[in-house]
Amino acid sequence: MSNLKIEPSASEPMISKYIHAKCAKAGVPASATFELTSGCNFNCKMCYIHSPDCEKSGGELTAAEWISLGNQARELGVIFLLLTGGEPLLRKDFPEIYTALKKMGFIISINTNGSLLCGEIEELFRNNPPSRLNVSLYGTDNETYRRLCGAPRFDKVIENIGRMRDIGIDVKINCSITPENCEDIEKIYELTKALGLHIKLTTYMYPPVRKDSGSTGFNPCRLSARQAAYYRVKYSLLSLGEDEFLRRSDSLNELFEAEDECVDEGDRGVRCRAGRSALWVDRLGNVYPCGMLAEKSCNAVEKGLAECWRTVNAETSRFKTPLKCAACKYRQLCPACAAACKCETGSFDTPPEYLCEMSRYTVDFIAKEAERIRRERNDG
């Protein structure tokens, strides 16, 4: 069954999807994420990694250790490499790490808050550009940034995005919608449209269990399930336009009517790339299927990346998501995954009720918006 969504399609090239699909079948990692640091010059309320005291909980790998892991990743077959944090550009040795990894031939993307894309970093990227920069956008003015991130740097971020585009670097926007910035959603859409930037917007926030093990099922900086659904549908309508929104709403209705709720046991496994064709290495060298499935199982500095990948890949194949989720008629638009189940409930096989509720509200809001559009067209 196709993965029917109401959001605009992602901009990932088809060749990347093909490579990941082939690698998943072969048990080979096509992509890796290196979480270079938990440090950050922002203090975002919804962050699942950084906190003011996070640096006290241990160090981070040296440049030499990250470069060694890069060589091991290349030997494993990794093609796509994402550098993230915290704020990865905050590391003083970032140029050393980045330059060495770039020479290895990886297709490198970088997650950043965008505030440091100037000076030495600008010159580094001018001479040796990454494949893409994923810049987090938290609002459309300095005041929203101050409330949500403790750093009124919106103007600087927009200026730096312009710098990067001027030197020919592809920029994608990541945006997380919270109670602090939900009223900016139309402005965010208009801004990214005016700048000609692709945006990935999400209204679902994972519980920050990596930062606080006691936060299972709870995130103090997220919308209610109903609000998350409302803003999800609102943004979809903004970005798709009425005609495409109506077409997709009709397709969803057909999908629900055809659903027989029969499910094969194989449908309960991990369906995303986590642990199948992708791996995640945290600042200490621990290897996980993804950044949200962070249960320590193997350290790459101690055991080597190849052994850790075999361990993670084998463990991932044993994950079973809830039978209720696999049989649910809303599963094609529900953001529930193995990581979400674990973060929301503490186990892989318990349905995450927050997401169940969000999906039900999403369907309800889609129907209401479609009805409103048709009624207004008929009245007009």
Predicted stretch roles:
Residues 2-132, 231:
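Conserved alpha-helical substructure of the radical SAM core
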Residues 25, 33, 197, 214-215, ...:
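Accessory C-terminal segments flanking Radical SAM cores
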Residues 43, 77, 129, 169-170, ...:
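Short loop/turn motifs at secondary-structure junctions
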Residues 46-48, 110, 173, 201, ...:
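Hydrophobic residues in well-ordered beta-strands that form the structural core
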Residues 61, 92, 152, 180-183, ...:
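Residue-level signal for the nucleotide or nucleotide-sugar donor/cofactor binding architecture
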Residues 69-85, 353-380:
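Short Fe-S-cluster ligation motifs
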Residues 88, 116, 177-180, 295:
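Short histidine/acidic/glycine/proline-rich micro-motifs that form metal-
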Residues 131, 136-274, 280-284, 292:
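Radical SAM enzyme [4Fe-4S]-AdoMet core and its adjacent flexible, acidic
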